[in-house]
């Protein structure tokens, strides 16, 4: 596809944001000085992976050209002024594997755990367990899928903001969905086979 001048914009990287995936991959994205591109204001841009970021000198202060892949997802098209790369924050214990940083112990990271638990309940079709409710449940001390599956109605009522209606709805949805879940669906939901 040919990229025309109105489909590309130049801006400056203001921040590299690190977010672990449910599989323990530490993915970089960048916050840029806001720009207009194809009728939208762009603030956040995908960087693909760590190797791409590293090889192209993408960090705070880099001048980059942005396009919208498929006129939707903003991504770095070109780096006009590369800069020295900084490592991820020290809170992340990582190693470079292939093109990505991978957490050395992803099960210890609460963001990874939140995303894994949320994905499990999405893949099993449980209603009412979006990320916000999963976070509330984890804040109440139920930090694994097994913990949540074993929760009683009384346990759900200890969760901040949960009343009878919400607690019953989520508990009933869990019981209904887990009973009808097939083995292949359960394998996908648990992510036991990996990425």
Task: Describe the residue ranges of each PLM region.
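RNA/tRNA-interacting regions in translation and RNA-turnover enzymes
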Residues: 1-195
């Amino acid at each position: 596809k040919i990229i025309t001048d109105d489909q590309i914009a130049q801006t400056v990287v203001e921040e590299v944001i690190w977010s672990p995936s449910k599989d323990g991959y530490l993915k970089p994205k960048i916050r840029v000085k806001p720009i207009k591109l194809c009728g939208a204001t762009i603030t956040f841009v995908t960087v693909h992976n760590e190797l791409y970021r590293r090889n192209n000198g993408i960090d705070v202060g880099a001048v980059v050209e942005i396009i919208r892949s498929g006129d939707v997802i903003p991504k770095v098209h070109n780096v006009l002024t590369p800069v020295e790369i900084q490592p991820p924050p020290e809170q992340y214990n990582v190693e470079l594997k292939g093109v990505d940083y991978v957490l050395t112990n992803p099960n210890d990271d609460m963001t990874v755990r939140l995303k894994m638990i949320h994905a499990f309940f999405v893949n099993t079709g449980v209603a009412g367990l979006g990320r916000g409710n999963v976070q509330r449940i984890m804040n109440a001390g139920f930090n694994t899928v097994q913990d949540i599956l074993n929760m009683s109605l009384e346990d759900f009522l200890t969760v901040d903001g949960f009343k009878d209606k919400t607690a019953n709805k989520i508990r009933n949805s869990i019981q209904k969905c887990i009973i009808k879940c097939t083995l292949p669906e359960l394998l996908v939901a648990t992510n036991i086979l990996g990425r």
